[in-house]
Amino acid sequence: MLKNKSIRNLIILAIGYWLLAIGLQGCAKREIKNIDSKGKNIICFGDSVTLGYGAENGQDYPTVLSKMVNAPVINCGVNGDTSGEAIKRLKTDVLDREPFLVIVEFGGNDFLRRIPIEEASSNTEEIIKNIQSAGAMVAITDISADIIMSSYRKEFKRLCKKYDAIFIPSLFSGILTNPSLKSDAFHPNGEGYKIIAQRIYRAINPYLQKNALLR
């Protein structure tokens, strides 16, 4: 009886390793558009969360991320921006700065202002296409906070798949529900931004390693 149980456990373990290997292989095969980008700058393009609202100077996630990738990261966060307002400054803040990777973080203010998800999605799609046309990689952040804004997660994930962009999941998960990690109802504090930077780094690092800029 004990022997049979041990054999069964070994089989289950082997199947688990096999499924994990398949999953990792699938991730490794996913191609990102402009993986060979000749751009020079990593740019974080977003709203008050990218700006670092609620934290002290130097605690914003682009600054923390810069230390992780050992390269400059340009912070192009503007307090209160919606995805539509972002389009108006896309050229001067992003496209004219020789981007090689742009991390896009919008949607929170669209949600708060009750802008239809279809409009936010259309704006995000335009942002993606313009950045990719400039020869840069694009990473879209999942700004859904645990159970709210799940429609944004689904829509942004769809856009990433359609345009071969990097999807950064669960940016705020466990942060806005934890008083020790947030400065108010909508913004992290320094510790919260550190977690966000770590999540972004984990998502983009495999693609950075394939590009000569950060080798």
Regions from the PLM with identified roles:
Residues 12, 19-22, 35, 42, ...:
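Compositionally biased, low-complexity repeat tracts
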Residues 22-24, 52, 58, 83, ...:
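Residues at secondary-structure transition points
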Residues 27-85, 89-98:
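Serine-esterase "nucleophile elbow" of acetyl-processing enzymes
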Residues 1-26, 129:
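Short, basic, low-complexity termini and linkers enriched in Ser/Thr/Gly/Pro
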Residues 2-5, 36, 64-68, 88-215:
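Alpha-helical cap/lid subdomain in secreted, periplasmic
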Residues 23, 74, 139:
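Conserved Rossmann-like nucleotide-binding pocket used by diverse enzymes
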